[in-house]
Amino acid sequence: EKGWTPVHATVLYDQMKRISDYFLEQNFDFERDFFCSLYNEDFFQPKDPDDLQSWCGGVGNSMIACDPQGRIFPCIRYMESSLNGEQEPYSIGDVDNGIGCTECYKCRINCMAKIDRRTQSTDECFYCPIAAGCSNCSGYDYQVNGTPDSKATYICVMHKARALGNLYFWN
């Protein structure tokens, strides 16, 4: 989210190096001993341009949330309590009438159904050489950009630091 700087990325990389050294000194077996989500050999490489799957699950029907007023949202991040007053809540229905019961709700559902990695990404993001494993949240995209179909890129500097930390660890 907004606020990450190269200073934060440097701290993350330095800390990942320290913990990597510890893991390696202890000779931990990542297959059997434990799991640390910071390290993943499958991430930090280009994504196939044909892979259009969006990282975020909040653009479909897999993360439905409901507020106390009975409004239905694609995810909790679209609710008023998550938007920090930066956007209007992005509901797609209500408990009395169902999902997609108005033209506005239908329009929002159609918008989200069309979101994929290509539509939400700039060319720099889409063709990033370490795109695999880069996460995003369409609700946060909506909060800062006014649309769920425009990827916020504040996390880039931290993803790069994590990639460097993985390079250090795995090599």
Say what each PLM segment does.
Residues 1-72, 79-90, 151:
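Radical SAM enzyme [4Fe-4S]-AdoMet core and its adjacent flexible, acidic
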Residues 74-75, 136:
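Short glycine-/small-residue motifs
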Residues 80-171:
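Flexible mid-to-C-terminal extensions adjoining Fe-S/redox cofactors in radical SAM and related proteins
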